[in-house]
Amino acid sequence: RFFQNGWNEDNFHFGSRGLTGYCRQMKPENIEDLIAAISLYRPGAMENNFHNEYVLRKEGKKTVEYFTGTQDILKNTYGVFAYQEQIMQLCRELGGLSLVEADDVRKAMVKKKYEALQQYKERFIPYYRDTYHVTQEYSEIVWDAIDKASTYLFNRSHAAAYAITGYISQWIKVHYPIEYWSVAFKYAQDFDYSRYIAEINKTGMCTVRQVDINISSTDVVINFADKALYWAITGVKQVAEKAATQILKERDENG
């Protein structure tokens, strides 16, 4: 729900404005959606409109279509090319190449080494044509689609690492909101405060309270009973840490 609503403030990787907006659009439902979001919300994929294509197919607003023989490999992304690993699998299954050769194809496509690609293209097209009983023209179309996609696809293993870390970050925010936000505020910049407070108010999982001279300290103070965060004394304009320390000393000594 947090990802779907774009409540991603201070979240690892998902906290950017662009990816937050894409999460609202995509409405991720599982870790696979989060991995896809990381991979598809990138310049190359976006220039080819694959990020929107994924959402439309996911929501059933557009028919999911597969090239012959690609469904098992592309079903998790609704027929959309999303990862470099998919390119390798397609070269292996459709073109009869070894995994080492498939990785060579991936590298050559990314670096646009057309001479190196030619030998693999000459093997891929007839193998795919004869094995899957498609036409020569269709085989060439599929090869060209793979070639085009490979130039901008992201590494799925990297995307998975980012997505899992982002999910863990979000899980902590949901289940331990007071602890999460107390740390977030401690390391936040001044321009972060308003966004953080806005999200806290939207989620309603805890509250941020103004400075209380009897409770507040130099850092945000947690009150578990009230599910509240008390603003730091140093958050008051023109009250530096030295002055705040003197205030706390006076409070401790004289009440």
PLM features: residue spans?
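Noncatalytic, beta-rich nucleic-acid-contacting surfaces in large DNA/RNA-processing enzymes
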Residues: 1-255
